[in-house]
Amino acid sequence: MSTNFEKHFEVDVDNCSLEQLRDILVNNSGKAPLANRFRALFNLKGHAEEFASKPEDALKATQYLAEAFGDESELLKHEVAYVLGQTKNMAGAPLLRDVLADDKQQCMVRHEAAEALGALNDVDSLDILEKYFKEDPLLEIRQTCELAIDRIKWETSEEGRREALQESLYSSIDPAPPFSLEKDYKIQELKDILNDQNRPLFERYRAMFRLRDIGNDEACLALASGFDDPSALFKHEIAYVFGQICNPVVVPHLKEVLARPEEAPMVRHEAAEALGSIATDDVLPVLKEHLKDSDSVVRESAIVALDMYEYENSNDLEYAPV
């Protein structure tokens, strides 16, 4: 490990108890580096996913994760909401509904809570999602609720059960499924759907994830064209999938988005983390530059991204060892 990154590994979270992981996550000591708080988060996620075999520990892990919603870090809280949606543990649903309904939480955190309810396929959350889709003053929240509603309805529909989808290379539960393999979409056709603002957002996301699953240079450049969209939500999802694909062809596009002074923090932060995942040599100075960014979400994302950069250039097999 290089000395530049040692400060990100000051606390060893391997083989910690659930309570020790919670203490690191919520920074009870006041000294836990952000990168290690993220490690504790992902370790707790692993426990929360074991609800079938270890229900008591899984419930406890879910509750400990939710304790972080009282933190000041917008980045950490949004990641907690994301993780709760990825666990498939329905114990997280009422906790996420509370976050969505809390107008004192930042937009990025509430958005992630709504998206997580969709990832959980929580039919019981349709009413609250409909409420905020119709009534919330923030476009990002309305759009996220729209996607979550459409995802839940698709998952529980005959169409959703019937469609033949490509087996994903990625473990994430996405806000929309990719387009079915039943039609042989050309990349240009998918690009046109992606950028057609007259189409439903759910359909455009389906094109996005189909392009992600193709993942070659042409598909990635088609995705990058979406960075001209007016929707911050849409652009942040494109940056997120670039962090999954890790194709260096998009590095110039991510750098440009990260450097936009007028761009929404939810987009810039996702671009920073994607650069950390891609981890080519030209990424390091860019991430270091944004350790002093004027926006706290982007600054913290640069810390996490640099931690990921170090991981990608090491021989470790797991980002969050359990």
From Swiss-Prot:
Chain positions recorded as Fe cation 1 binding sites: H78, E79, H111, E112
This protein's name: Deoxyhypusine hydroxylase
Function summary: Catalyzes the hydroxylation of the N(6)-(4-aminobutyl)-L-lysine intermediate to form hypusine, an essential post-translational modification only found in mature eIF-5A factor.
SMART domains xrefs: EZ_HEAT
Molecular function per GO: deoxyhypusine monooxygenase activity; metal ion binding
EC annotation from Swiss-Prot or TrEMBL: 1.14.99.29
Annotated organism of origin: Kluyveromyces lactis (strain ATCC 8585 / CBS 2359 / DSM 70799 / NBRC 1267 / NRRL Y-1140 / WM37) (Yeast)
Compartment annotation: Cytoplasm; Nucleus
Family indicated by similarity: Belongs to the deoxyhypusine hydroxylase family.
